[in-house]
Amino acid sequence: MNYMTHTCAAVLCSALLCLSTFDASAADPPAFESEIFKTGTLVYSDDFDGEINRERWGAPTKDKQIRNGNLVVAPKFQSKEEAMKALKRDHHLGLEPVVHINRIPEAFVCHLRYKFDTKKLTPGRPSFQIGHHMIVLNYLENGGHRIKLPDGPSFTETDSGMKLGEWIDLVIEYKKGEIRMVVNGHGKTYKHDAVTIINEKDKLGPRFTFKGGPDCQIVFDSVRLWNCEE
């Protein structure tokens, strides 16, 4: 075997080794990190490069579609008249995007990258409910966020710089009585008796609820969810 053949064989072996290493690392689950929990089991991971996960999001519908590696949620109807004609009612008309992430563990760590793509705030919108109608994360008028506990206090955090139309990198660590929120790298832990995601009236929970308001789309880029133990 001459020098050129040896060289080509060596290059080919190196390329195959790099490829196999890349494949192995790409298949590795994301690393678990937490300030509250010692261990966590990854139960859901999604970059929206395939079909909608029905267990977590429900069935795909015209207002909930995967596009270009994102899950995009839009209003079901564009006008009140159109909605009333289709639904045969005058309430819950689907004029704003609403979506749920289902089957949330009772103790968890969640990484989310998402945005509410809209230009202005309206009363109570957009909002992200951690537990249906429970802990609420919403925007401040001039940037930043507010966390409202159910039947409890609110916490205002301006340093996160959270703004409409911009990606939010969010980490949530939760167990009853304690929640840690890291919004765009700005993290704080809250301990209070009102920290709970359990809504006894919600037969489909615990779950996350996103409500966008008028003229809005909700866009998700990635989700990671761990079931945790202390």
Predicted features by range, described:
Residues 78-147:
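Secretory/extracellular carbohydrate-interaction modules
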Residues 52-83:
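Extracellular glycan-recognition surfaces and repeat-rich motifs
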Residues 192-221:
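Flexible glycan-contacting loops in extracellular carbohydrate-active proteins
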Residues 28-61:
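Extracellular carbohydrate-recognition regions
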Residues 9-20:
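Bacterial N-terminal signal peptides
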Residues 48, 112, 166-183:
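Short tryptophan-centered beta-strand motifs in secreted/extracellular beta-sheet-rich domains
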Residues 33-34, 96-102, 156-162, 209-210:
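Beta-strand-rich interaction surfaces with strong enrichment in secreted/lumenal proteins
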Residues 149-169:
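Short, aromatic/His-centered strand-loop micro-motif at the edge of beta-sheets
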